[in-house]
Amino acid sequence: MSKRFCVTGTCIPAKNYMVDISGRVDMIIHDYIDKGQYFTINRARQYGKTTTLYMLEQRLKSDYLVISLSFEAVDEYFASLGTLAEGLMMDIAECLKNQNASEIIIEEWNEPLSDKFPLRSLGMKITKLCKASNKKVVLMIDEVDKSSDNQIFLSFLGLLREKYLKCQQGKDITFQSVILAGVYDVKSLKLKIHPQEETKYNSPWNIAVDFSMDMSFNINDIKSMLEDYEREHNTGMDIGQISSIIYDYTSGYPYLVSRICQLTDERIASYEKDADEKKAWTKTGLLQAIKLLLKEPNTLFDDMTKKLLDYPALKDMLQKILFDGIDFPFKRENPIIDLGVTFGFLKDRNGIVAVANRIFETQLYDTFLSEMAVNDKLYIDAASNRNQYIASDMLQMDLVMKKFYEYFEEIYTENDHKFIEENGRKLFLLYLKPIINGTGNYYVEARTRDNRRTDIIVDYKGKRFIIELKIWHGNEYNLRGQKQLFDYLDYYKEDRGYLLSFNFNKNKQTGVNELEYDGKKILEVVV
């Protein structure tokens, strides 16, 4: 049976095309497990945590007794200390059987717990197990934060902490290493020790060391997966180029990398009209796959939408970054920034808060714009007249820009400067989106965005259009903007670009102008 790309559950090397993470697994074993460290792998949703634990288990089994658990769908365990102890005892017994532990060890483990002190009794069982085993014992728990707000779970963490500290003092024998995996960092749980007590940061998991390994995929990681695919399919793809494009859009977010590859393989190369495997694994094919990804419902984007509803301050920060070009200093001590990083939405770019990747940026732009579009006249006009912007099956960007000038003058010319300065870029994106929707892609260049400048890159059926949006205060600033755009065209090897200037000078001259410099042309629209 041939392999497939996998985006749900655990990736299995024999069944799935996947990044070779053996180097990371070896490093975790050497730097953490062999050294007896307790740690938490806390990363965003669908970031490869479960697959990493699976690969760790496979590598560890020859040298360690591995107890691998998951708190997914075990809510009933947390009804009381007794049910938690019984549930863990049952699950660990199953692990011992699967690891071919001796009958004596299994029989001792299955002896009844104390009714009065179930958790203390479980702790004594752990000591007996670790003494009796001829291998050191490693405990791994996935989806650990599914019950992390539960006081009973915290009592279990307290038990592990107590046993760890006693072991350090030579007074107990316990697990060699404990690995907890989830989205949230269990070390920073907010606890209420008593119902009336104020909320505190007081996690019993402060014995854990920091797990700082980068679990995102770099270009070479992506290459390793595509090389595996190419050995079976012989598409003739340029693996280096394809890996770079995927990385440019995903910044190595594991789910996004695998999903783009999966859509390219299973939709673009197999089921789309005029499907051709060789054509699919090109830049054009990848952009089609990215377009499908941004249109489809999936658990990652659903979770993003939910988090934006649950955390309005995070949503407000994202809007200020995307639409206003505001630079926020990156400090994870700020709880909003910390949440954004925890969810995988934000990252540190040279000390400034940035959206984690281009796919997330576009998804967030689309989400925010869709909220505005319902009653927006500019969006409705652009959507209803979309066909006029397409000729010979190609987007006519000159006409798009000229019509925006007409619509803007008609609809928004009487609005005050503050409204235009705060919303001008949103209005243009609202206008552009329905015109290219369904056929073209767009993204905003994060490297050049600030509170006065936004560069938009549109890909339409293989043709690229570069549009620079400027807030214009003074002629010198505008001339500098024109020079920047000419340089940008040179970087992208394009001969024509577009400049949209929102001019707030008293004696401004609005209109459409043609500019030329060093063989390159710019269509400038001033509103």
Which residue stretches match the model-derived regions?
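The catalytic "switch" region of P-loop NTPases
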Residues: G9-T10, S148-Y249, L263, R267-P297
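Conserved catalytic segments around the Walker B and adjacent sensor/switch elements
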Residues: T40, K61-Y77, L139
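Conserved NTP-binding/hydrolysis module of P-loop NTPases
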Residues: V66-I67, A79-E103
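Active-site metal-binding core of divalent-cation-utilizing nuclease and nuclease-like domains
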Residues: Y431-G462
